[in-house]
């Protein structure tokens, strides 16, 4: 009894998340690839990132690799501590966070979540991935889990929802450069895709 979906899952592969697959429990090159999820639950293998302005920590479940060496775990922890510090910086003209996160990928994910009114889109099932390399950035996506989509009857923004702790986006949206990126992403969508959406749906 219930509703079941047959769908692709999210995993590292050439036709899925196309990044270098990092070996489990390895010290070979801990810079990547990584596939992680900001998770609702702290039951799966994860690291915890302390969030001083939240009622709970940010739980980062690692999907690939699945088993971490001490060096892999240390690298992942350092990466997300650095992301937290850069995103929650008081100076919203800082570009430090852009050295860690792909801004336009985050803007695209934000537009999708906002259009879908997915209130828990930055609370759980919030995937990020990073390819191998010291200078590669974390890329938001792929999208997953729209169980609470179209459920926002308060006509507010998804990051402003007391029901769910929305991680990262509640401060990322305050950066003027991110706001401009969101305008550009939505403008491109409205100009190039929205006009032909009915035709696409009818195919």
Where would I find each of the regions flagged by the language model?
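Short, solvent-exposed loop/turn segments at the edges of secondary structure
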Residues: 2, 31, 123, 164-167
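Structural recognition of the beta-strand scaffold that forms the well-ordered cores
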Residues: 2-8, 34-37, 108-109, 127-129, ...
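Internal "kinase-insert"/substrate-recognition segments embedded within catalytic cores
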Residues: 2-111, 119
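C-terminal catalytic region of ATP-dependent kinase domains
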Residues: 66-70, 77, 117, 133-203
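A generic fold-level signal
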Residues: 104, 121, 134-136
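Catalytic-loop signature of eukaryotic-like protein kinases
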Residues: 118, 123-132
């Amino acid at each position: 009894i219930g509703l079941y979906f047959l769908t692709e899952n999210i995993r590292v592969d050439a036709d899925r998340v196309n990044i270098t697959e990092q070996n489990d429990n390895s010290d070979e090159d801990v810079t990547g690839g990584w596939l992680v999820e900001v998770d609702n639950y702290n039951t799966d293998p994860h690291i915890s990132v302390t969030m001083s302005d939240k009622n709970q920590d940010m739980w980062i479940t690692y999907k690939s690799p699945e088993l971490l060496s001490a060096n892999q775990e240390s690298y992942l922890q350092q990466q997300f501590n650095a992301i937290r510090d850069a995103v929650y910086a008081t100076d919203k003209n800082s570009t430090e966070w852009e050295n860690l996160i792909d801004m336009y990928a985050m803007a695209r994910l934000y537009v999708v979540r906002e259009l879908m009114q997915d209130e828990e889109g930055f609370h759980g099932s919030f995937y990020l991935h990073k390819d191998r390399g010291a200078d590669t950035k974390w890329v938001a996506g792929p999208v997953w889990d729209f169980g609470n989509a179209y459920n926002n009857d308060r006509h507010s923004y998804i990051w402003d929802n007391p029901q769910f702790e929305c991680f990262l986006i509640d401060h990322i949206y305050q950066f003027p450069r991110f706001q401009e990126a969101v305008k550009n992403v939505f403008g491109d969508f409205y100009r190039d895709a929205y006009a032909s959406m009915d035709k696409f749906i009818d195919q």
